[in-house]
């Protein structure tokens, strides 16, 4: 009887956060802060063009924010990822402006905080170009993941451009 009451009490008190599966294989977790973590799933990555230097993919993502209150859907995002061992980049439109982010996986002039804040870009790039596991690993060991895939990027720090 007490076992049944304990199970019932647990079931009735379970929050939406407990009911969700935070270990879903298709999710890639990016930046985590005090209010939770950014996550995404790849809905589409369509090859647009391949050259000697790399491959351009048109991407569509489903984005989320996970916290103690549960996982909130943040909608879909479209963009482009240029998979290149020498010029890795991400492009997207935000508020009517085109934004480009050039990755510097071996940055020598970038603070640890800056690298941490760019975790979403790193996760997205490596997940599209090398698979979800590489994206997940890049959040915690960007240089190691880039090195394991033969990257040789000369940028001393990551760069963002808006037009």
Predicted regions and their residues:
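N-terminal signal peptide c-region/cleavage motif recognized by signal peptidases
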Residues: 14-16
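N-terminal secretory-pathway/extracellular module detecting exported/lumenal segments
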Residues: 20-163
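Bacterial N-terminal signal peptides that target proteins for export
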Residues: 1-5
């Amino acid at each position: 009887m007490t076992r049944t009451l304990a199970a019932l009490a647990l079931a009735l008190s379970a929050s939406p956060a407990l009911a969700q599966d935070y270990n879903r294989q298709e999710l890639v977790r990016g930046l985590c802060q005090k209010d939770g973590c950014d996550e995404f799933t790849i809905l589409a990555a369509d090859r647009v063009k391949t050259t000697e230097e790399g491959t351009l993919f048109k991407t569509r993502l489903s984005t989320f924010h996970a916290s103690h209150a549960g996982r909130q859907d943040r909608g879909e995002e479209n963009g482009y990822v240029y998979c290149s061992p020498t010029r890795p980049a991400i492009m997207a439109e935000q508020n009517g402006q085109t934004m480009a982010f050039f990755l510097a996986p071996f940055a020598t002039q970038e603070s640890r905080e800056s690298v941490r804040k760019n975790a979403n870009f790193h996760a997205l790039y490596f997940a599209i170009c090398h698979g979800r596991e590489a994206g997940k690993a890049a959040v915690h060991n960007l240089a190691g993941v880039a090195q394991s895939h033969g990257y040789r990027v000369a940028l001393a720090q990551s760069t963002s451009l808006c037009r």
